[in-house]
Curated annotation (Swiss-Prot):
tRNA-binding listed as a keyword: no
Annotated region (Interaction with SIRT2), positions in chain: 31-89
Protein name: Protein BEX4
Gene Ontology terms: biological process: chromosome segregation; negative regulation of protein ubiquitination; negative regulation of tubulin deacetylation; regulation of cell migration; regulation of cell population proliferation
Residue segments, region Interaction with alpha-tubulin: 31-119
One Pfam family recorded for the sequence: BEX
Domain of life: Eukaryota
Length: 119
């Protein structure tokens, strides 16, 4: 039995031979003129030839797959930390939004006019 490398090499050689056979133009038979289908002299001949299967690299997404061996206690701690961070962010944004509103709601202190320089 052949190895995988030899099979791949034979498969590749077969595809190359098939491409060469498809790429050749047939010679005109006797009493038949060569016909040019559209296009001018500047076009490359055989532009619509099927080239066989195109081999593409498969992207590696292993970096996106999470590690399956996670201790549940660590995951619980991460969730608690994340929830705490979200609550802190919500509290800060609420304070920022309410700052402008509360500014007009609070009365002036008793000694405000003693220190206020605006007439």
């Amino acid at each position: 039995m052949e190895s995988k490398e030899e099979l791949a090499a034979n498969n590749l050689n077969g595809e190359n031979a098939q491409q060469e056979n498809e790429g050749r133009e047939q010679a005109p038979t006797q009493n038949e003129e060569t016909r040019h289908l559209g296009g001018g002299e500047g076009q490359k001949p055989g532009g619509n030839i099927r080239r066989g299967r195109v081999r593409r690299l498969v992207p590696n997404f292993r970096w996106a797959i999470p590690n399956r061996h996670i201790e549940h206690n660590e995951a619980r701690d991460d969730v608690e930390r994340f929830v705490g961070q979200m609550m802190e962010i919500k509290r800060k944004t609420r304070e920022q939004q309410m700052r402008h509103y509360m500014r007009f709601q609070t009365p002036e202190p008793d000694n405000h006019y003693d220190f206020c320089l605006i007439p």
